[in-house]
């Protein structure tokens, strides 16, 4: 299965500077997505995100096999790449990267996360949270890897992102919009989720994907 997906990113403002703390990539023609949020020193946000996402994307794009296995292997590759990069740093407190990812299988959505992040599936007027309700700290290096899956159908809407993308205001706006028009473009919904965070300068990333 494939999905039409859109990524929306809001930058964080730290000490008067707007920094990219969050990022996401849509992979394999829309059948997979990875969302990352950097933890630690702001000056290391970009290199940590790049190292982690590059490793995940390369593994997901190049490997063959079952979707769940590819997801697991890509997460391990991302963790190893981040750990290798950090081995070369001299820091009192090492940064980390929270990762949330999903891949579409044959009528099954496979998801996993390490650290904070959320995934929801909206189908025929009902929205179900796929990720656990707990919001663990840390990321790939320190948080447990949590896995989940659910059935998937054409027309389903997947909403995923950093925890900061799912504020009460953002969720209420997106839910009301979908209630009025279930066929809203993914770009509209992704931007709705990150708008409140952008206005508050706290940073967020959201992905909206409609299954075809």
Task: Say what each PLM segment does.
Residues 153-212:
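C-terminal catalytic subdomain
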Residues 63-122, 193-201:
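Catalytic core of PPM/PP2C metal-dependent serine/threonine phosphatase domains
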Residues 34, 113, 158-160:
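Residue-level marker for buried hydrophobic side chains located in beta-strands
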Residues 1-59, 91-97, 108, 117-126, ...:
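N-terminal entry segment of metal-dependent catalytic domains or homologous docking segments
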Residues 53-64, 79, 179-182:
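Short amphipathic alpha-helical signal-transduction/dimerization elements
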Residues 1-10, 58, 67-69, 73-74, ...:
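Extreme N-terminal targeting and regulatory segments of eukaryotic proteins
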Residues 44, 48-52, 66-74, 170, ...:
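Short amphipathic alpha-helical segments
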């Amino acid at each position: 299965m494939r999905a039409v997906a859109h990524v929306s990113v809001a930058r964080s403002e730290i000490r008067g500077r707007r920094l990219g703390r969050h990022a996401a990539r849509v992979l394999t023609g829309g059948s997979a997505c990875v969302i990352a949020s950097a933890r630690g020193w702001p000056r290391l946000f970009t290199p940590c995100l790049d190292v982690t996402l590059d490793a995940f994307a390369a593994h997901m794009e190049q490997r063959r096999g079952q979707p769940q296995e590819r997801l697991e292997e890509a997460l391990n590759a991302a963790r190893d790449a981040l750990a290798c990069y950090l081995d070369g740093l001299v820091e009192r407190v090492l940064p980390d990267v929270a990762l949330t990812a999903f891949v579409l299988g044959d009528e099954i959505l496979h998801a996993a996360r390490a650290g904070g992040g959320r995934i929801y599936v909206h189908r025929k007027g009902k929205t179900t949270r796929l990720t656990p309700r707990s919001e663990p700290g840390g990321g790939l290096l320190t948080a447990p890897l949590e896995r989940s899956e659910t059935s998937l159908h054409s027309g389903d809407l997947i909403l995923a992102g950093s925890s900061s993308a799912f504020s009460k205001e953002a969720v209420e706006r997106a839910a009301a919009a979908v209630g009025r028009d279930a066929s809203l473009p993914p770009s509209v919904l992704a931007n709705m989720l990150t708008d409140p965070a952008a206005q508050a300068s706290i940073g967020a990333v959201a992905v909206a994907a409609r299954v075809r």
